[in-house]
Swiss-Prot record:
Family: Belongs to the class-II aminoacyl-tRNA synthetase family.
Record's subcellular location: Cytoplasm
Domain of life: Bacteria
PANTHER family in the record: THREONINE--TRNA LIGASE, CHLOROPLASTIC_MITOCHONDRIAL 2, THREONINE-TRNA LIGASE
Keywords: Aminoacyl-tRNA synthetase, ATP-binding, Cytoplasm, Ligase, Metal-binding, Nucleotide-binding, Protein biosynthesis, RNA-binding, tRNA-binding, Zinc
Native species: Dehalococcoides mccartyi (strain ATCC BAA-2100 / JCM 16839 / KCTC 5957 / BAV1)
Catalytic reactions on record: tRNA(Thr) + L-threonine + ATP = L-threonyl-tRNA(Thr) + AMP + diphosphate + H(+)
UniProt KW Ribonucleoprotein keyword: no
Needed cofactors: Zn(2+)
The protein, known as: Threonine--tRNA ligase
Length: 582
């Protein structure tokens, strides 16, 4: 069931066309700003971009003009021509383009290729379409800042993004998807629904969980804890900092230092914010002598870690600098490994299904170039993961070289509303850290026996999982996860007492409910509850008091009058079963 990712596959017609669209856009921008300095302009998954150093800041109002000029170039049916020349000739050609000159200096060959169309030429390996008229369906989307070569110490360029497809129908479909994705963007919904906030005064990538988001997170964490206790895990807690020497022993200081924060001096010793929880769990395991009969031992923690990310890649909750992992580490004998990984995959699938995720892909990531340990152990660990995937009948792709430095891993990646993949559950087999920390148990023969270790998360980080969950449901969480599950709306002041009585009964069942007794009209109250994506609105008036019923209106617009007792039973059943249906 494994498919190898083929990085050597030929360039598709679509990718070629998108690359050509980037060149056409560059020519259009140069016609508006002849003094522009050009960065790079590749094809990307859904289109293209090009980076420019311009005399003024672009605004969204500039995009239609650039697009108009692009369309004129397309209609001109200009040929794309490839030329080869020496690097010295190319330096003369790009004498006024400093970024191109820098790229030229990095090329080791003495001969380089350029592409021309119309009055434009670019340093480029190609290939391109034959004529500009082949670029038929494109749309400029946005402008963003991008540091030259991704280096925050280099100039900030202006990046123009565009979408491009082989036909207009495919482009229209993609633009419709973008429109829907914009509605579901967790950054937008996070603000509207008051789930979380980010503040530059605190720092980039550091999240405040607001009350509505905090209750959703709490519910996820409580469910996570109960499920882990049921499955034989022990809950633990660990500190947020540790001495640098600990990370030197683990190998993180050598292999992972660029993702760690700078050390802080405490009483003459160097400490650092933890990027991982694993080393703490290892020391807990070593807290006393253990027998092989105790294995497997499973330690689980909702542990907050800190990893450096460049400011340019921070993205709402999806890419942050401080986050809480649903982390666990399993210590077991070698012959217990496969069974334990099978169990972890079963738990991960159970979690994914419970939260209603349907779009995700599974990757088996193998040995990277920089690694520790013996090859035979790497092969054994990789084989264990593959067998566990096949035992669970989970289709997967092999992702060569994407394992961590101490072992191979299974990655389950959630797909967001834009089709982008975000890291979710991960399972890693590790023989190296137990060796580095001399982890062993007393075997049946009374001698020390080596221990294997499984690193795993079944949600990923709470922050990233919340971003995926928010976009999955467009902020309209299932009833069991909704910050407010019901809103009781009295039609007039005389109905407020009855509304409060119903709310009190629901609160006794731990339902999150409020009464909207404000002076606004009933329609305004219903509208505001719908905007807050509250699953159920219970309208009560004279009839409802007389019959002990409620007029139930769901956030999707369906309406039904039913006895209050019946509604309460229905809601409690949906909460208990964690139904994704309203």
């Amino acid at each position: 069931m494994a498919n190898q990712i083929d990085e050597s596959k030929p360039i598709s017609d679509l990718e070629i066309m998108r690359h050509s669209a980037a060149h056409i856009m560059a020519e259009a921008v140069l016609s508006m700003f002849p003094e522009a300095k050009l960065g790079i302009g590749p094809a990307i998954d859904t289109g293209f971009y090009y980076d420019f150093d311009l005399p003024r800041t672009l605004t969204p109002e500039d995009l239609p003009e650039i697009e108009t000029r692009m369309n004129q170039l397309v209609k001109s049916n200009l040929p794309f021509r490839r030329e080869e020349m020496s690097k010295d000739e190319a330096r003369k050609l790009f004498a006024n383009q400093p970024y191109k000159l820098e790229l030229l200096n990095d090329i080791t060959d003495e001969t380089v290729s350029i592409y021309r169309q119309g009055n434009f030429c670019d340093l480029c390996r190609g290939p391109h379409v034959n004529y500009t008229s082949k670029v038929k369906a494109f749309k400029l989307l946005s402008i963003a800042g991008a540091y030259w070569r991704g280096d925050e110490k280099r100039p900030m360029l202006q990046r123009i993004y565009g979408a491009a497809f082989l036909d207009k129908a495919s482009l229209a479909e993609y633009l419709n998807m973008l429109e829907e994705a914009a509605k579901r963007d967790h950054r937008k919904l996070g603000k509207e629904l008051e789930l979380f906030s980010l503040h530059q005064e605190i720092g980039g990538g550091l999240v405040n969980w607001l009350p509505n988001g905090a209750i959703v997170r709490h519910l996820i964490e409580e469910f996570w804890k109960k499920e882990h206790l049921k499955r034989g895990y022990d809950l633990v807690y660990t500190p947020h900092i540790a001495k640098v020497d600990l990370w030197k022993t683990s190998g993180h200081w050598g292999f992972y230092r660029e993702n760690m924060y700078s050390p802080m001096d405490i009483d003459g010793e160097e400490y650092v914010l933890k990027p991982m929880n694993c080393v703490y769990h290892i020391l807990m395991f070593k807290n006393r002598t253990r027998s092989y009969k105790e294995l497997p031992i499973r330690m689980a923690e909702l542990g907050t870690v800190y990893r450096y990310e460049r400011s340019g890649v921070l993205h709402g909750l999806s890419r942050v600098r401080g986050f809480t992992q649903d982390d666990a580490h399993i210590f077991c004998l070698y012959d217990q490994l496969e069974k334990e990984v099978v169990k972890v995959l079963d738990l991960a699938k159970f979690m994914i299904d419970t939260f209603g995720f349907t779009k995700y892909k599974v990757m088996l990531s193998t040995r990277p170039e920089k690694y520790v340990g013996e090859l035979d152990k790497w092969e054994y660990a990789t084989d264990i993961l593959a067998k566990a995937l096949e035992a669970n009948q989970i289709p997967y792709q092999v992702d060569p070289g994407e394992g961590v430095f101490y072992g191979p891993k299974i990655d389950i990646k959630f797909e967001d509303a834009l089709g982008r993949a975000w890291q979710g559950p991960t399972i890693q087999v590790d023989f190296q850290l137990p060796e580095r920390f001399d982890v062993s148990v007393v075997g049946e023969d009374g001698k020390d026996q080596p221990v294997a270790m499984v690193h795993r998360t079944v949600l990923g980080s709470m922050e990233r999982f919340m971003s995926c969950l928010t976009e999955q449901y467009g902020g309209a969480f299932p009833a069991w996860l909704s910050p407010k599950q019901a809103m009781v709306i009295p039609i007039a002041d005389r109905h407020t007492e009855f509304a409060e009585k119903l709310a009190c009964e629901l609160r006794e069942e731990e339902v999150r409910v409020e009464v909207d007794s404000r002076s606004e009209t009933m329609n305004q109250k219903i509208r505001q509850a719908q905007l807050a994506k509250i699953p159920y609105m219970l309208v009560v008036g004279d009839k409802e008091i007389e019959t002990q019923s409620v007029a139930v209106r769901t956030r999707t617009g369906s309406q039904q009058v039913m006895p209050f007792a019946e509604f309460k039973s229905m809601l409690l059943a949906k909460i208990k079963t964690k139904s994704t249906e309203i």
